[in-house]
Amino acid sequence: MAPLSDFEKQRQENIQRNKDLLRKLNLDSATDSISREIPNQRQANGAKKRKTNNAAKPIKKEPQEPSRRSRRLAGVTMENTEEYQKVKEEMEEAERKKKELEKLKSTRLFGNFHLIDLVTDKRSGDMKFEKKVLKLPNEIKKEENNTKEIKEEEDDHLQDDDINIESDNKVLEILKDLGDKFSAGDFYDLIRNSSSDYDDKGLESKRNEFDNLKLFERFDPLDIKITHQRITAINFHPSKTDRVITAGDKVGNLGIWAVDSTEDEDPAITILKPHGRSIAKILTPHSNPSKIYSCAYDGSVRELDLNKLESSEVIYLKDPYESQDYPLAVSDINLCQEGNPNVLYLTTLGGHFYQHDLRTPFKSIKPNSLLRLHDKKIGSFCINPNLSHQIATASLDRTFRIWDLRNISKSNSSWSEYEDQISPHVYGSYSSRLSVSSVDWNYENRLVCNGYDDTINIFDLSSESSELPPVTEWSKTYQTGTKNKDEQIPTNIKPFTRIKHNCQTGRWVSILKSRWQASPGDGIQKFVIANMNRGLDIYDQKGQILAHLTDSEKVGAVPAVAAMHPIENWCVGGSASGKLYLFE
């Protein structure tokens, strides 16, 4: 035999090393296949290699038992068992009911139903829940006495695999969502044409006046960007000649727009940053219109002087119970209109109330100077413009409450979960299904509130439409009657009218808040609120809609934060992109 070359030796070593490795892995059969595919040199010379059979022994597979067996395969007979008789009776009963249902198809329906109960199959035309719907009156009366069985029957229908209601449910959910998104302002044209019996002679002329309002034409709304981020607060300055609009956003920017400035081709807008967090409220004192006050979640209230062009801090609230500098986020501010116009009221996200005289320097607050009005966030509050000691608050706890600041004590806070709190006397409250977003008070003692229950509620405390005495005559211990004596805060305030309005703003749109016009020059009390269909709705204090302001071509977003000029019937709304829509 000729000696092997170096290359052949290396090749044989590689083959042997691979065989050893495969043998360790218990893959000898794979080694044989490799050997057959790559014959060695001796095979090329005609010498045959002894065939080895080291293949692993096959594992005997046991037949897999079925997880379920029928009674027939198991050899079980059912004819004489109680279970078989029960099944047979059920089948006979089902056949009988089927014949009755065929007969009932030609009769009218009895009782009330959900829409899903009346859905029919698109191919056959039969009701998908005909067994539930097609019943005689005596059967309905019988089932009314056993609501539990009815509920179980409904669940059985909804869980029936033979009934496909997925597509129908989607359609009905769409209809439901559309119903939730409807607002009365969406049907302004229809409501206007159907309200000819309204006894107010000025209603039609007032609607005509608002119908003539158009978007500010000098600039494209896309160019009127007053803040960098989503607008959270807006204020229409009372000036009628040189109009000024201010707006704040969620990061503390404050934009000022000189509406009637003609010096530049672009809108005369200046954006400041007086706050570190979201601006909650902007207001202009009636007694000093050259100043603008703003509050924010950073705990500060600042004064902007238009004459001096200065911004100064008026109040900084920090938690008196904390050793470190922990700010109390200010959620709303208002100035007294009756009595002393220099007193500023404010509320916090923690449910507190605080008041400060602007003529005196601010000092660090003490624990007993904070009043407890709610245990949760106060999103909005208002002052009775006729009596400054009466305020109303709207809270995340699903209520709005009316308070008397003349009667303050610890005993008034027994309702609170917090200890050693001080509260004013509460006249009563209104309870909502969901959070109450805002409340506002006008000169004729009407209050308007709205919240996430998709309603606008108007309350009459002037005694014109209720048996209660006028709110201005309530004593500091007055409380309307309540049926439940265990209620620490009675739910005794009822609205005299309720308006359907979509308030589901979601995450990216600011909360909708209804606001009265402060001093209407035409003498008609009215409030404005944004409409989720990219518009502004205006109502009078009777709940009659006066206008639905929009422009389908130019209004590109929801003007969620809305305000009216204090005197003139001009409206402005701010969007999530920091843009303004002015109707004049």
Swiss-Prot record:
DNA-binding protein that binds to both single- and double-stranded DNA. Binds preferentially to UV-damaged DNA. May be involved in DNA-metabolic processes. The keyword ATP-binding does not apply. One of its GO terms (molecular function) is DNA binding. Belongs to the WD repeat DDB2/WDR76 family. This is DNA damage-binding protein CMR1. GO terms for cellular component: chromatin; cytoplasm; nuclear periphery. GO terms for biological process: DNA damage response; regulation of DNA damage checkpoint. WD repeats lie at residues 226-267, 274-314, 373-413, 431-469, 506-549, 553-584. Residues 76-110 form a coiled coil. The keyword DNA damage applies. Residues 29-90 are annotated as: Disordered. Residues 29-44 have a biased composition (Polar residues). Keywords: Coiled coil, DNA damage, DNA-binding, Repeat, WD repeat. It comes from the Eukaryota. InterPro entries: WD40/YVTN_repeat-like_dom_sf (IPR015943), WD40_repeat_dom_sf (IPR036322), WD40_rpt (IPR001680), WD_repeat_DNA-damage-binding (IPR050853). Residues 59-68 have a biased composition (Basic and acidic residues). Transmembrane segments: none annotated.
